[in-house]
Amino acid sequence: MAAVKDSCGKGEMATGNGRRLHLGIPEAVFVEDVDSFMKQPGNETADTVLKKLDEQYQKYKFMELNLAQKKRRLKGQIPEIKQTLEILKYMQKKKESTNSMETRFLLADNLYCKASVPPTDKVCLWLGANVMLEYDIDEAQALLEKNLSTATKNLDSLEEDLDFLRDQFTTTEVNMARVYNWDVKRRNKDDSTKNKA
């Protein structure tokens, strides 16, 4: 089955049947028939299969940790972008007046300094990695609105991916329990057969 890039968003793919793949997260396949599953090549013993399933489970846990970190980072960025947009809107109103704008800016943790800012049509934005660029207020506002939209879409996508990942946890845990129970039944059957003999 071929996968093609979809317009759903960054990192998302759609398969031929319209199902969505999530950021390269492999889908855990539910084991319906444990007997036939255990007869497949590579599934010689229950311990081997349980080890593989546990490795898969640990990979899902690692992916969850990474996605949760991205989610926290985005949840921190979105309010900052909104606050900066509010400041730009305020500056947009004030740029026509001749009065200076009084403000406080952060020097260090819990240390602010007062400043008087004359009306201006230019602002400087931190872009990250110690890079700051000067923009017209309108350009800065457009850039920040685009960044806010992208961050919101990415957050929604991360939420969906985390939900998908939780489903994979559940499926993997159920598979592990089914294989373990199958092995217990098999050993009990073997023990009862030996006791009869």
Swiss-Prot record:
It is found in: Cytoplasm; Nucleus. The modification N6-acetyllysine is found at K59. Pfam families: Prefoldin (PF02996). Disulfide bonds: none annotated. GO terms for biological process: chaperone-mediated protein folding; microtubule-based process; negative regulation of amyloid fibril formation; protein folding; tubulin complex assembly. Its main location: cytoplasm. Belongs to the prefoldin subunit alpha family. Binds specifically to cytosolic chaperonin (c-CPN) and transfers target proteins to it. Binds to nascent polypeptide chain and promotes folding in an environment in which there are many competing pathways for nonnative proteins. This is Prefoldin subunit 3. It comes from Homo sapiens (Human). The lineage of its organism: Eukaryota, Metazoa, Chordata, Craniata, Vertebrata.
